[in-house]
Amino acid sequence: MCSSLCALLLVILAVHNVHAKSDPELHMTTPQIIERWGYPAMIYSVTTDDGYILELHRIPHGKTNVTWPNGKQPVVFMQHGLLCASTDWTMNLPEQSAAFIFADAGFDVWLGNMRGNTYSMKHKNLKASHSDFWEWSWDEMATYDLPAMIDKVLEVTGQESLYYMGHSQGTLTMFSHLSKDDGIFAKKIKKFFALAPVGSVKDIKGFLSFFAHYFSLEFDGWFDVFGAGEFLPNNWAMKLAAKDICGGLKIESDLCDNVCFLIAGPESDQWNSTRVPVYASHDPAGTATQNIVHWIQMVRHGGVPAYDWGSKENKKKYGQANPPEYDFTAIKGTQIYLYWSDADWLADKTDITNYLLTRLNPAIIAQNNYFTDYNHFDFVFGLRAPNDIYLPIVDICTKDYNGK
């Protein structure tokens, strides 16, 4: 889950503010932001087995030449979280953003976009204006989107494997796919870097916990009546909130920050406050209401179940009345590096220690990195993240790729 959810509360407060300053990046796409900072940007598309057309963004190299022993660059793939997009990895200044840091280190950087977000709104046969376009959750992202994007990247680059860095839902989909892997997919992932890793979300805190426990029945009822649809798309209202509140007077920008902290965890001392309007203008990037229902089901269930269609439909789909659980104990063959924090209210410490760490085989956990003061968004937007997380990952991948 990502900073996009801040806009859920902010949009109702948006009013015109003559003092607000508009950053040009508020209205740019990911490739435009990349090019604004002097980096090359490329766009690719891939079609999933169930017909969704996903857009991938690529930074093929940085501003300096880096020579690799075998003549080929290492490939890193970055996957956003819930309600987010490829933009998340580029929204800070270049020396603070993961995508640019890896590009300048000589990596071929690829940024994924899951179905239903700003950049992945197409299907071979379905239209986004129709309900059937939105009948999916992260189940389908893990089953279809993730392997389709990974295979496309490897096809274009001519590599056999890549380094994967995911945040929040971007870790959940990888864990889930690996748990059902027959051994072939795992060989394509050299190393899996899990930022704010998500398994169970039973013990989440803050606004989302309150929503899941006290308003989920109302949300379910709305979903039952109106069916599948789009949830929190990136539109003019969100950009208005980003500009006029997050980019307004100090009292208003502080309000913007505090709403975000209500969702992500305690107030952060490592945000670039001048970039908050940019964050809020690109997130939320949209998802399906059915995906939100699936997350609510996870809060209620306390584990990582497949989507619950109801006992009758579950029997048709799964052969049993209750949805099956993803078995994280079955994950093997990929080295995993965990990055989590006591201050993260979404990838909660209790969920990680009581669920994730008790199920992942210790043999595949290469590193278990614990921070005391990172909230959920700090792993992507925090000013200490480059030194604490990104550059150490660059070093790990560089040594691995060079065979050291």
Swiss-Prot record:
EC id: 3.1.1.-
GO molecular function, one term: hydrolase activity, acting on ester bonds
Signal sequence range: 1-20
InterPro entries: AB_hydrolase_fold, AB_hydrolase_lipase, Lipase_euk
One GO cellular component, as annotated: lysosomal lumen
Induction remarks: Up-regulated in the intestine by fasting. Down-regulated in response to a high-glucose diet.
Keyword field: Glycoprotein, Hydrolase, Lipid degradation, Lipid metabolism, Lysosome, Secreted, Signal
Function noted in UniProt: Lipase that, together with lipl-1, plays a role in the response to nutrient deprivation by controlling lipid metabolism. Specifically, involved in the breakdown of lipids during lipophagy, a process during which lipids contained in lipid droplets that have been delivered to lysosomes by autophagy are degraded.
Family: Belongs to the AB hydrolase superfamily. Lipase family.
Protein name: Lipase lipl-3
Organism: Caenorhabditis elegans
